[in-house]
Amino acid sequence: MPIDYAELHCLSCFSFLRGASQPAELVQRAAELGYRALALTDACSVAGAVRAHQAAKETDLHLIHGSEIRIHQGPLLVLLAPCRRAWAELCALISLGRSQARKGDYRLEREQLEGTLPHCLALWVPDDAPHDAEQGRWFARHFGDRGHVAVALHHGPDDEARLQRLLALADRFRLPAVAAGGVLMHRRGRRALQDTLSALRHRRTLAAMGTALECSGERHLRSLHSLARLYPPALLRRSVHLADQCRFSLDKLRYEYPAELVPAGETPASYLRRLTLEGARRHWPQGMPDKVAHQVDHELALIAEMGYEPFFLTVHDVVAFARRRGILCQGRGSSANSAVCFCLGITAVDPARQSLLFERFISKERGEPPDIDVDFEHERREEVIQYIYRKYGRHRAALAATVIRYRPRSALRDAGRALGLDAATIDRLAGSIQWWDGKRVDPERLREAGLNPDDPRLARTVAIAGQLLGLPRHLSQHVGGFVISEGPISELVPTENAAMAGRTIIQWDKDDLEALGLLKVDVLALGMLSCIRRAFDLLAGFRGRRLTLADVPAEDPAVYRMISDADTMGVFQIESRAQMAMLPRLRPQTFYDLVIEVAIVRPGPIQGDMVHPYLRRREGLEPVDYPSEAVRGVLARTLGVPIFQEQVMQLAVVAAGFTPGEADALRRAMAAWKRKGGLGPFRDKLLKGMRRNGYCEDYAERLFRQIQGFGEYGFPESHAASFALLVYVSAWLKCHEPALFTCALLNSQPMGFYAPAQLLRDAERHGVEIRPVDVRHSDWDCSPEHRGDGEPALRLGLRLVRGLNRRAADRLIAARGRRPFRDVQEMARRAALHRRDLETLAHAGALRGLAGHRRAAWWQVLGAEAGLPVFEDLHIEEAAPALDAPAEGEDLVADYTSLGFTLGRHPLALLRPQLRRRRLLTAADLASTGHGRLVRTAGLVINRQRPGSAGGVTFLTLEDETGQINLVVWKATAEAQRRTLLAARLLMVSGIWERKGAVTHLVAGRLEDWSDWLGALDVRSRDFH
């Protein structure tokens, strides 16, 4: 007689630090073993449900959705959702439990289950506790004929006695008994990993766990024959009978967007059309261009057909709120392909000036929801988030989750803790690897860290860390993806508290939402928008000139000259090493050149061998040819080279006969082929289609190779155009208002590639007068001050003083506003400043105007005490002793410690005599050095970068008193001198100086760490992946 079984109690790794297998692994294994069904029942969670759902679609396995719930001081239950209403009940219960506990935990009382789960099926998992009788009575009374007793047998010595006890309990309370394995892993081989997770959950070492570990390795998916030897046939049959009652699938979820934004008497479609046309009239008072009018009609018809009008209205409402509050915002990504989004004010890409491909945004054939990403000022985005919560209520709006997974360092740290390694060893072990090392731990790296790779405990740590890699550790919040629903969101998906106060998240991430076709609004943060808005405000205040993104003077030759000279420190998107190297070669002269510049310095075009052909054609070194007029129509604006995702899609349509939906499927496959494969069928279809349309084999193959390159991350043109606008605006501000732009940049930190030290030196090179932090003049923010010639000087703000309390600064500014300070004592009394605040200001040199040099300021601080308001008019004169001023080096160290920069001489200017004796060249010397020369130089390391697309090459920027030096370190050199490369603050480099046109760099040979020369100087680099 065939054996049939459904596993009804199974935890995946989304029961964090309990389950040791991915949902897909459990589904695939259950299907391999011939199970009828599998219930994924993670602890108070459905975070892994969508992944299991997708995996089950690839098999014949019937997937059941449920959750394990431990009642506070009560029984352990497994709740199953047989229908859509039961799913809503389960999600609401999980949401309630999560809302009543700290992040990562849950709490539910018995009475909270009573009457709330009328459609759920339930399994009671007895604990072998003296409370079984009382718990059984409650369970039977509450669940009645929907309740069952779960029987879990794991080849223990008392299995027979346990079976009889559980059957007796079932009989006593007239509940059917059913086999259920309490599964924690898909195969027995995960036992060591599961033990490690248990130790981490209990915050103990494995050695100290004792009986807290599972008593056997049997909590895995077992063969049907193994189960048949353990369980009475009736219990196995009942598992199938119960599974057959559960017909709910996530495919049955239907999502409704809020409709309350639609005025009475209108439909969502009519209201969206009205708003779109009103926006069009603002942009084109003389009437929409025919091309745009046709595009708008086409988009509105498709939006109506897909039922997406409420989604567009919601995004419009959020953007309109931001604009009413003066919060700068701009849509980006594929939504910038939409003329409707432009008319609604969501995006800034003018459809009359750009070539849009709406199918990149919405495709009927794809049948998936559109994705609208809107960037807001990073420091004011919270206002937008809280507006959404107020507008729709927390019961209808929540942020998507992000799954935080184990990466190499965190895996090594947790594995080391579980195995009882001491903290110092764990630090050395984790510090021995970098992100680019991947999963492998090189024994040589361990030796460099002073560890013995042959130590058995260390080897075991590395092995367990390898198993931890990729497992989810916990849920965090998405950067800004909001799900907003017509009804309670907790009936669609459970919600829980985020770590950040005032935030609620759902238990699914963006990939889960996309898989189920659920819409989200991306409310993202962008530091450059904060900077630009601040710069606009400063411009209005200083010059009385009010600008917006739309009316910054366009196509300014001076701006393009500055960009072509790679004078772009601080400019959005084009301040990186790679962009600065490209700018003198591409030499942008128009806005569309900026669109190309943004897109071309990306892994996609680089890997697809598109960059050099484009540059050669732009320079006239290579002819531009098109195999057909149709291809010319797609590629003429990029000189015959496909640079944007939309171009690849259009080529597939015009050259290979793809439908727009098939072209979008190709685009999606491009993005995932390295992870999932799947480009093979598209290759065949593309090559056959192009041959059929008369294109030669070589051209078709070349196009396919370029498409593969886009799998390394190619930009949509619409996204590049959105970013190019911010590139131009920030470049215009830098070109024409360098003081105000630098001021705005400093007030928007942290952001960008460069620290304030580099931004300030760059501003000085542009003729900006920098005035120091001074308690007599500085506000919290940096601010412009009038010079004699009508131009602004830049006064540094108190925000730059490390460790200064904002409330103390506000008190100081308020007291100064009433009348100026006479000395430090009076300031301390009137502003109620504490000794620590005064010491911080003295160390930063901010008391120089009241007390003189740092030592004199320190002396006055020692005699100052914070006062009460009643004494603020009291002034006591006390003579200060004559103290020698600090040496220049002492001031330099204090500047860097308290501010991170100096307005005095650069540190290397002080070291230059010693460096000259060693024949080390400056950045200025190198600027006039010929190509191919062997040179030696040294500089402060200000940033390190190792892009994933660079084949292991590391890029560094060094700085001395005369400028910056771009350093290229090939992979072999980097590995051979790894410690020096990563640790040096002052780096000496010997290598080959390379020059090609205006692009220069030093290819490193030998590296030496000269950081000892800096002593206590606190110099920090900004390091990037």
Swiss-Prot record:
SUPFAM superfamilies: PHP domain-like. CDD domains: DnaE_OBF, PHP_PolIIIA_DnaE2. Keywords: Cytoplasm, DNA damage, DNA repair, DNA replication, DNA-directed DNA polymerase, Nucleotidyltransferase, Transferase. Belongs to the DNA polymerase type-C family. DnaE2 subfamily. It is found in: Cytoplasm. Its main location: cytoplasm. GO terms for molecular function: 3'-5' exonuclease activity; DNA-directed DNA polymerase activity; nucleic acid binding. It catalyses: DNA(n) + a 2'-deoxyribonucleoside 5'-triphosphate = DNA(n+1) + diphosphate. The keyword Mitochondrion does not apply. NCBIfam families: polc (TIGR00594), PRK05672.1 (NF004225). Pfam families: DNA_pol3_alpha, DNA_pol3_finger, HHH_6, PHP, tRNA_anti-codon. This is Error-prone DNA polymerase. Its EC number is 2.7.7.7. It is an enzyme of class 2 (transferase). Coiled coil: none annotated. DNA polymerase involved in damage-induced mutagenesis and translesion synthesis (TLS). It is not the major replicative DNA polymerase. Transmembrane segments: none annotated. GO terms for biological process: DNA repair; DNA replication. InterPro entries: DNA_pol3_alpha_NTPase_dom, DNA_pol3_finger, DnaE2, DnaE2/DnaE/PolC, DNAPol_HHH, NA-bd_OB_tRNA, PHP_dom, Pol/His_phosphatase_N. Gene3D superfamilies: 1.10.150.870, Metal-dependent hydrolases (3.20.20.140). One of its GO terms (cellular component) is cytoplasm.
